[in-house]
Design a protein with these regions (language model features):
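Conserved N-terminal beta1-alpha1 strand-loop-helix module at the mouth
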Residues: 1-101, 106-121, 125-134
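Active-site/ligand-binding-proximal alpha/beta "capping" segment
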Residues: 132-169
Length: 169
């Protein structure tokens, strides 16, 4: 299977519940939370810990990647393409201040998912796809006080590029 075919297959699996980890320093507790999320229906776990040391982030990312492989879920590393590559994650998610989608793609290669935060902005999503992103995050799906409801275009933006045009919006 070619690398781009592998990426398309991974992106096609990026449907359903997508869980993002909390900042938890206890690796065993974090892995237990991730296992519970997968047991509850999460199809992907995005490892995100903004305050951990590099060593802790690598250890936790490795543990989550192993869990996701064992349970058939996708593993995504937040903000750090080099870490995603080192631990063998299925992909990386980059925000506005985490470097470009193109540089993340260069680090993780063509077979992994590269997602990008688009902050509910269609031009940002279009740019991310042009740079090689396979998944764009449009905003939170949970109801937040004072947060507007997601529009149809926002929902479309949150779909992996491989799923667009397949009647899933």
């Amino acid at each position: 299977m070619a690398a781009t075919d592998d990426r398309a297959a991974r992106a096609a699996r990026l449907t359903g519940l997508y869980a993002v980890t909390p900042d938890v320093d206890d690796t065993a507790a974090l892995v237990a939370k991730c296992a519970a999320a997968i047991d509850g229906g999460a199809r992907a776990i995005q490892y995100r810990h903004k305050t951990a040391s590099d060593a802790l982030r690598e250890a936790q990312a490795r543990a989550i990647v192993a869990l996701c492989r064992e349970r058939g879920a996708l593993s995504i590393v937040n903000d750090d393409a080099a870490l995603a590559e080192r631990v063998g994650a299925d992909g990386v998610h980059v925000g506005e201040e985490d470097g470009s989608v193109a540089s993340a793609r260069a680090i993780v290669g063509p077979a992994r998912i590269v997602g990008a935060s688009c902050y509910d902005a269609l031009p940002r999503a279009v740019d991310a796809v042009a740079e090689g992103a396979g998944a764009e995050g449009g905003g939170p799906e949970q109801g937040l006080l004072g947060h507007r409801s997601a529009s149809v275009s926002d929902t479309w933006l949150c779909l992996p590029a491989a799923n667009r045009g397949q009647g899933r919006a």
